Amino acid sequence: MAATEILNRADIVKAPQVRLAPQPEKPSLIGLLRDDIAKLLAEKGVPERQVKMRVSQLWHWLYVRGVSDFDEMSNVSKDMREMLKEHFTIARPDIVEEQVSGDGTRKWLLRFPPRGAGRPVEIETVYIPEEGRGTLCISSQVGCTLTCSFCHTGTQKLVRNLTAEEILSQLLLARDRLGDFPERDTPQGAIVPAEGRKITNIVMMGMGEPLYNFENVKTALLIASDGDGLSLSKRRITLSTSGIVPEIYRTGEEIGVMLAISLHAVRDDLRDMLVPINKKYPLKQLMEACRAYPGLSNARRITFEYVMLKDVNDSLEDAKELVKLLKGIPAKINLIPFNPWPGTNYQCSDWEQIEKFADFINQAGYASPIRTPRGRDILAACGQLKSESERMRKVDRLAFEAMMIANHGED
């Protein structure tokens, strides 16, 4: 088989035998802060003098060792393990499908159990291996309310917010599948960084608007960055928003991770059409929130995402206005060649025009990387994620190029 055929082939891995997702009446300990775990243990009769120690044990097993079965907690007494099994769960979501691109990009379709009177829901999580690092793209909602006109996810109505458990479980499951916990083996065929952690960066850039699910996203990211557990540096966590201005201020004050803005236009009239939330929070308000974001410097910049749409927002005049708009903000501008999907009215800018746009911005003093094509054979690209119930047939999706999220977060 020719090398090009191998690189353009998507390997679909059937769902492995995994522990079934939890029943809704059994609360999960995943996604709970220490104080919340302590309260639950006390309610179940754990003596007050033992609660703090038990919480520390559980935290270590959940987030350092990555176990998904209470019986694996070898330094926890048998009676305690039986109580935990009876009342709680730490199971992972079901893997419906795992797809592996020829370039090593992995996409998981995950199913979470019903919540209340709801139905099971499915979301997608994507892993992008690169030399020296690996980035996990995490979803925050099932569907999206923002209806950005160029985004495939935006054509799927919002079903519900993901819980902190469901957000964090995407990271835990990915680390499981990549052998990224102690004493876990890397799966055969996985393309991962040669040394150190397999997942070094996470980006909240999957399905949904993270800041419309602020509290759950906040809890999940605080746990992910906790130094006694998963221990991801906040400089390696990037939250992307379309511009929910009040929560941008809260993100800086309460979470403190890196910020990315889905900008895509430099004029309010055009951004109103491309990113309708702009009608509520126009560019002036958005830029004020960005300038006020805590800790900005040349080493800690805001990433501005700009999808390149042919004859829509890709002129040199647009580039000039972009430089003017961002004046005074430590920034990096990620240029995203548009990822086509069935039914879209947009086209990707010509490559020559993208390079001219990038050169102008670069000469003005801004880093302006063009996203590297990744996962093009598995529809894993920015703006293309959708749950399986909304998915096109494989023969259709293989007709469309996709470009995987890359170059996000700080090294």
Curated annotation (Swiss-Prot):
Query: How does the cofactor bind to this protein, according to its record?
Result: Binds 1 [4Fe-4S] cluster. The cluster is coordinated with 3 cysteines and an exchangeable S-adenosyl-L-methionine.
Provide the binding site for [4Fe-4S] cluster.
Answer: 144, 148, 151
Cofactor(s) needed for function: [4Fe-4S] cluster
Segments forming domain Radical SAM core: 130-379
Keyword Protease belongs to the record: no
Q: Name one GO cellular component term.
A: cytoplasm
Binding residues annotated for S-adenosyl-L-methionine, in chain numbering: 208-209, 240, 262-264, 339
Its primary localisation, in coarse terms, equals cytoplasm
An example GO biological process term is: tRNA methylation
Give this protein's Gene Ontology molecular function annotations: 4 iron, 4 sulfur cluster binding; metal ion binding; rRNA (adenine(2503)-C2-)-methyltransferase activity; rRNA binding; tRNA (adenine(37)-C2)-methyltransferase activity; tRNA binding
Which reaction equation describes what this protein catalyses? Answer: adenosine(2503) in 23S rRNA + 2 reduced [2Fe-2S]-[ferredoxin] + 2 S-adenosyl-L-methionine = 2-methyladenosine(2503) in 23S rRNA + 5'-deoxyadenosine + L-methionine + 2 oxidized [2Fe-2S]-[ferredoxin] + S-adenosyl-L-homocysteine; adenosine(37) in tRNA + 2 reduced [2Fe-2S]-[ferredoxin] + 2 S-adenosyl-L-methionine = 2-methyladenosine(37) in tRNA + 5'-deoxyadenosine + L-methionine + 2 oxidized [2Fe-2S]-[ferredoxin] + S-adenosyl-L-homocysteine
Family, similarity comment:
Belongs to the radical SAM superfamily. RlmN family.
Q: What is this protein called?
A: Dual-specificity RNA methyltransferase RlmN
Q: Give the gene that encodes this protein.
A: rlmN
